[in-house]
């Protein structure tokens, strides 16, 4: 029960911005996109 509550709390907190769950994927996605772009450009160039 506690574990289930924690999971729900994390999910509810994620959109709030208190949990690193949401900001992490957002930052990671941006970093990955930028890195991918540079990698592709380097490969093409």
From Swiss-Prot:
GO biological process assignments: asexual sporulation; sporulation resulting in formation of a cellular spore
HAMAP family for the chain: SspP
Protein name: Small, acid-soluble spore protein P
Keywords associated with the record: Sporulation
Induction trigger: Expressed only in the forespore compartment of sporulating cells.
Disordered: annotated segments: 1-45
Organism domain of life: Bacteria
UniProt key word Acetylation: no
Protein species of origin: Halalkalibacterium halodurans (strain ATCC BAA-125 / DSM 18197 / FERM 7344 / JCM 9153 / C-125)
Location(s), subcellular: Spore core
Alphabetical list of Pfam families matching this protein: SspP
Bias (Basic and acidic residues): 1-12
Family named by the database record: Belongs to the SspP family.
